[in-house]
């Protein structure tokens, strides 16, 4: 059986999701660190133009998109499952919501002054001279990826983010995982 090779970078939340799932399923894997921003000539050549992170390589096969990667890993190692039998559809719906709505609300906060200082400077109080250029370069790169995508204005995104975090907290009331006694793809996506 071919090795699992995860192409990723350390600070990517979608990469972290897949790294955690690989650990949860106790799958051996190899790591290839890729650039955060363009140009990524090796990545684009290998993926046929896909530039997002992460992607999974198994032999000559390349799997792009973390939702697809979850399905591939589930097929390769069915236990422990990411999709509890009685909640498979719900797990997928919550994971998709987290990957889309929760993620973009969180990103709006990450590009606020305190969020960017934390993300690029290591502390919400880091001076802008320490992180400003990195944040601008990263933000410009991500803007090219988001062309045509609807975005919430920053104040609306902050309100939505707080609301989403309250909902997740409510779901965790009295239990350790979002959908019950064991982790599911929903937990890894919301993490």
Describe every region a protein language model picked out.
Residues 1-132, 153, 178:
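GST-like domain detector, emphasizing the conserved glutathione-binding G-site
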Residues 102-191:
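GST-like fold's C-terminal all-alpha helical module
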């Amino acid at each position: 059986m071919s090795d699992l090779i995860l192409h990723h970078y350390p600070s990517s939340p979608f990469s972290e999701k897949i790294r955690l799932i690989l650990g949860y399923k106790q799958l051996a894997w190899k790591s290839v660190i890729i650039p955060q921003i363009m140009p990524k000539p090796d990545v684009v050549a290998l993926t046929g133009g896909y530039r997002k992170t992460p992607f999974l390589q198994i032999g000559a096969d390349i799997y792009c998109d973390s939702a697809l990667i979850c399905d591939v890993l589930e097929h390769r190692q069915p236990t422990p499952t990411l999709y509890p039998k009685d909640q498979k559809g719900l797990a997928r719906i919550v994971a998709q919501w987290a990957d889309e709505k929760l993620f973009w609300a969180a990103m709006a906060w990450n590009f606020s002054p305190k969020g960017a200082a934390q993300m690029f400077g290591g502390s919400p109080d880091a001076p802008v001279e320490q992180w400003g250029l990195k944040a601008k370069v990263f933000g410009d790169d991500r803007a090219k990826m988001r062309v045509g995508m609807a975005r919430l204005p920053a104040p609306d995104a902050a309100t939505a983010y707080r609301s989403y975090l309250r909902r997740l907290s409510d779901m965790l009331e009295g239990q350790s995982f979002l959908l019950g006694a064991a982790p599911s793809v929903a937990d890894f996506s919301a993490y």
